[in-house]
A protein has these predicted regions:
Chain A
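A broadly conserved sequence feature marking short terminus-proximal activation segments
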Residues: 1-23, 69-122
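Residues immediately within or flanking Cys/His clusters that coordinate Zn2+
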Residues: 18-20, 44-47, 119-125, 143
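Short cysteine-rich clusters marking metal-coordination/redox-active sites
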Residues: 23-26, 47-50, 124-129, 146-149
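General detector of N-terminal leader/presequence modules that precede the first folded domain
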Residues: 23-36, 40-56
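Short, non-ligating residues that shape and space the ligands of small metal-coordination modules
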Residues: 31-33, 56-59, 133-137, 152
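Short linker/helix segments within small regulatory modules
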Residues: 35-44, 135-145
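Short metal-binding segments enriched for Cys and/or His
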Residues: 49-68, 75-87, 151-152
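Acidic, proline/glycine-rich low-complexity IDRs
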Residues: 107-108, 122-126, 133, 140-152
Length: 152, 272
């Protein structure tokens, strides 16, 4: 039986209400307002730097991915450790099967505190009237691409 | 070509590549690769760029046949050659209806086909896309149709003691969500008050560390309230103590999320 487990990773926005994103193609970081990204019609985001559209999940930042991996590993280890305990209970007193428990497993990574730095400059895209925060590098380019329609 | 037409051309080209990246099976990947090549071929400006970079003809029948099954494509060092090599490779793939298995196998990651397709497109096709988008930007400047600024820069005038916040959360498992907790007008004082209460209520194994953290936060809050200078040494002591407390408090707790807010606000206090 396949049981779905939902693990939530939370990260607060910065003081201006923006959250970090990172392009998996060009590795450039930028920030958007989570509410804008969650609007129903937003199926993809254009990277303000390289302009390539991708699924919003392709823009998760390294710290969030680290915590997703850590939480997932922790959950898997909890299940295995519990399974070991259950196995021990099931065969307790059984003459034919002996269960020898080892040390409980420990995760290789642990979740890190997630918080936003107050960096980057706010830009407002005239095409969609939406705001984003971009780095100096993107600012210095020919003009950032709008994350919502891809125009620069 | 008008300014608008040029922007549409650039956008359509980038979108065609974005679609390729989202392909989940090999038939779809080949169909989208054909569309991508068609976008290049039917657009004179891009096609002209490809022709300008044409250095020599590559025999991809031979290259793919002779290539070890585990070897990735040996891309040329020279930029012009790289453009021509990747374009000819994609032409060869689409004209001969090759399966991604036939040429992209070394780019696999785990068992998922989607990763093989994505990695090939990221490691190989993305290089061509990068050259073409750079060329389009340069072309726009030369044609004099650049300059109409779509992105306007907004000066960030938030300041400590009166910063407006619109806090939310990013949930990163399979969806992105936000919960808006509007704390408009919330200042360093209210964060400090909340933090002190959380520090007092939370069981922290290291009592001295907890005591130091509370003292530092109280001292900073008092100085801000009285309009006194907050010395950098005090900020450093508070930051160190609170960072250590974060490690003991555990990720995801109210304390662990309030501490970074306070640290950030404190570090933003203008120095005299």
């Amino acid at each position: 039986m396949l049981v779905e487990k939902r693990i939530e990773i939370t990260k607060q926005t910065d003081h201006d209400g923006f959250s970090s994103f990172e392009c998996s193609l060009c590795s450039e970081g930028f920030k958007l307002v989570p509410g804008d990204v969650e609007e129903d019609h937003v199926l993809q985001i254009f990277c303000p730097s390289c302009g390539i559209p991708q699924d919003p999940l392709e823009f998760l930042t390294e710290d969030v991915i680290h915590n997703i991996n850590a939480e997932t590993e922790q959950h898997a280890i909890d299940l295995l450790n519990q399974f070991s305990i259950d196995l021990d209970k099931i065969f307790k007193g059984n003459k034919n099967v002996t269960v020898k428990k080892g040390k409980p497993l420990k995760p290789s990574i642990s979740p890190q505190p997630l918080f936003e730095q107050n960096d980057y400059d706010i830009v407002e895209f005239q095409c969609c009237l939406k705001k984003a925060k971009v780095s100096t590098l993107i600012k210095a380019s020919a003009g950032p691409y709008c994350p919502y329609c891809g125009v620069n | 070509m008008s300014y608008e037409d040029f922007k549409i051309l650039s956008k359509n080209f980038r979108k065609a590549f974005g679609q390729m990246l989202r392909a989940t099976d090999m038939d779809e990947a080949l169909r989208l690769t054909k569309r991508f090549i068609s976008t290049i071929d039917k657009e004179p400006i891009i096609k002209d760029f490809i022709e300008k970079n044409h250095t020599r003809v590559y025999d991809f029948n031979k290259i793919i046949e002779e290539k070890n099954g585990e070897d990735k494509f040996d891309l040329p060092f020279d930029e012009n050659e790289e453009v021509s090599y990747i374009y000819q490779l994609l032409k060869h793939i689409t004209e001969n209806n090759l399966s991604y298995y036939d040429f992209a196998f070394p780019y696999r990651e785990g068992r998922k086909i989607v990763n093989m397709i994505k990695n090939f497109n990221r490691e190989v096709v993305n290089l061509l896309v990068d050259h073409i988008t750079s060329y389009l930007e340069e072309k726009a400047i030369k044609m004099g149709i650049e300059g109409k600024q779509n992105a306007k820069y907004v000066f960030n005038n938030s300041s400590v003691g009166n910063f407006l916040s619109n806090e939310g959360d990013v949930y990163g498992d399979t969806t992105l969500n936000q919960t808006n907790n509007n704390h408009e007008g919330e200042g360093i004082q209210s964060i400090a008050k909340e933090l002190i209460q959380l520090l007092k209520d939370t069981k922290i194994d290291n009592a001295e560390l907890k005591e130091d953290a509370i003292d530092h936060v109280e001292e900073i809050a008092k100085k801000v309230e009285n309009g006194e200078e907050v010395k950098p040494s005090l900020i450093r002591r508070a930051t160190t103590a609170l960072t250590n407390v974060t490690g003991l408090a555990g990720a995801g707790t109210a304390l662990a999320t309030t501490i970074p807010q306070f640290i950030e606000a404190v570090q933003a206090i203008p120095m005299p």
